[in-house]
Amino acid sequence: MQRSLVGSEMCIRDSPVRVELSRKINRKAIDELSSFLEIGKKHFISVKTPLDMSFVFQLQHYLRDKQELFFEKRTPRDTPELSLKESILGQVEKKDVLLSYPFESMKPFIKMLNDAAEDPDVVSIKMTLYRVADKSQIIDALIEAAENGKEVIVLVELRARFDEANNIEMSHRLEDAGCQILYGLGDYKVHSKLCLITKKKGDGFEYITQIGTGNYNEKTSRLYTDLSLITANQEIGADASRVFMALQRGETVSDGDVKHLLVAPKCLQNKIVDMIDEQIANKNAGKPAYIGVKINSLTDKVLIDKLIDASQAGVKVELIVRGICCVKPQVEGATDNITVISVVGRYLEHSRIYRFGVGDDEKIYIASADFMTRNTVRRVEVATPVYDAHAKDKIRHIFDTIMTDDEKGKELCADGEYVDRKINSTPIDSQEQFFEEAYKNADKSADNQ
């Protein structure tokens, strides 16, 4: 897409979905607006709340003397797995690293991009961008890399809802600095969180790959719970390279193109179905079987039906679904073995985790995709396997702790109602526990330095 056409293209794509009114207006005005906006009258909604709530953010300045109204201040901690005094690239070459936001800081990832921008052995940086902060250090690092002669290829998704204007402005900044900009795919939104750094090594090249569940956004990394894997696994890097090559051609990868990554729209849903079938087969053969999934929403009928099949086969299925969930658990003869909980706490639960199996045979993935049809077959999404033993244990701990949350967690019942949970003698707030652990780990790391 030519740069000069980007703004007009966005105007064509944008269309209203509803009209909110702060007070009643006469029917003729509604008729005129309905005709002009080409939107049905049932989508005109009167609300009692102010139409623009942005003023709420300013209230904190007027309520400073009422600290009882505020949460206790929490600051993301430095992970003990990395030293910010050394090259992040060099450290990741030795060992995979899993960052858990907002409990751990995003600083190591930003430093890695800055290191890559200055490293003479780095030849290219490729990224998919969906939402970024207004004053983004990530964008600054990419610009510096391009100005230093690196090949920087960035796919900017212009259809990220509510961020269209910011993404257009950001893409222009990158392009002016010499970055090659890809403006998404016509048929699919690119929602994946993928970054690939390529370095010269001897007579060949080396990949450093980052795959995450959340956006490359410094602000939301302090407000959303997300996971970010940084790995020097060369086969995962080769898969990521094929994903970017396909995107540069305006295409998406197919089953035969990738060996490790699950990539929607063509090879994510079917792979998940296969892994659910494996657990059903294990249960039928008398072997241990387990499925655990943490997502924002569950609406994909193909995956719902397959989870019900697993439950009917006797497989234990644990689902952490923050929002929409179109499966009713604990229905006799259908979902007896499915448990669904939702955690709504101080931070927005946003990470996606897929678990299949038990013990040494367990497969663990982190992903950008929810179990929604829009994610599994209508977007470009990426899920990565986690192979590092420490990272896998960290994900298990996160998942299992959330499953015991009886402070902010609610359990979905067969009648569709969410109820309080009583599991622990002292209620557990999983998010608070993760922050306490992050503080302790950071303190121990500081003591050992």
Where do the PLM segments sit?
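Glycine- and acidic
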Residues: 15-17, 93-100, 121-128, 151-157, ...
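Active-site cores of enzymes that catalyze phosphoryl transfer or operate on phosphate-rich substrates
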Residues: 41-124, 203-275
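Internal gly/pro-rich beta-alpha loop/helix module
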Residues: 31-38
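PLD/PLD-like phosphodiesterase catalytic module centered on the HKD motif
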Residues: 1, 23, 148-220, 230, ...
